[in-house]
């Protein structure tokens, strides 16, 4: 069994990419479980055609303990037999959502939820912002990390940060970076830019997903593109990505770069203006722009 995780900047399309890719993998006969590691509990809605499934933490809070929760109450079967679980999280402003991930994964392991699977896919909230959200990496649960990004500055910044998290636990836990998945935002020279970032991070751009309105049309119906419009070009893009992940053996220890190197890359591709141009635009000298 392979355990993989999808990380990336909040709002980049991780859950959509994860579920559509898993649908493609299931089409190819893979036995898969999605574990949603996000308090929003939206990691399985396209597979189950529902708003949000009941989470492990919600049921544990209702019952008083996670030991009082039954596996079949939180593991639901979705599109093409994909098993779906949501870890959930506490009420806003109370407690640690990262603890929900830890509790849920331990519960699943202890109750034999991972038996007879080819893949477990963790869909993890946003950046590596705290130890709890890094838990699938830190505890050696996820062995392959796929970073969903785009040619936008903050998406690339997040990708570099996530690479730092992978590097931190690469030697102790054996986790590796499987590649970058570019979920296009139609940024100029986006493919070249992500390929350049991938090279600097000692990885590759595994796949470029073009922007297509059919993704939103499918989501409005709580379906993956592969189920909603199986013959469209976008469905084939997700199938291609699914095959690449299944066949991927090129797993590497990343080499994250400094903020200065990242900014220089963005300047080189015209995403950011250099200090001279910014100084000219705001009527200051480069010296005045320098950090104190």
From Swiss-Prot:
[4Fe-4S] cluster binds at residues 96, 130. InterPro entries: NifH/chlL_CS, NifH/frxC, Nitrogenase_Fe_NifH, P-loop_NTPase. Pfam families: Fer4_NifH. ATP binds at residues 8-15. Keywords: 4Fe-4S, ADP-ribosylation, ATP-binding, Iron, Iron-sulfur, Metal-binding, Nitrogen fixation, Nucleotide-binding, Oxidoreductase. The reversible ADP-ribosylation of Arg-99 inactivates the nitrogenase reductase and regulates nitrogenase activity. It catalyses: N2 + 8 reduced [2Fe-2S]-[ferredoxin] + 16 ATP + 16 H2O = H2 + 8 oxidized [2Fe-2S]-[ferredoxin] + 2 NH4(+) + 16 ADP + 16 phosphate + 6 H(+). Binds 1 [4Fe-4S] cluster per dimer. The modification ADP-ribosylarginine is found at residue 99. Its cofactor is [4Fe-4S] cluster. GO terms for biological process: nitrogen fixation. Its EC number is 1.18.6.1. GO terms for molecular function: 4 iron, 4 sulfur cluster binding; ATP binding; metal ion binding; nitrogenase activity. Homodimer. Belongs to the NifH/BchL/ChlL family. NCBIfam families: nifH. The key enzymatic reactions in nitrogen fixation are catalyzed by the nitrogenase complex, which has 2 components: the iron protein and the molybdenum-iron protein. This is Nitrogenase iron protein. It comes from Synechococcus sp. (strain JA-2-3B'a(2-13)). The lineage of its organism: Bacteria, Bacillati, Cyanobacteriota, Cyanophyceae, Synechococcales.
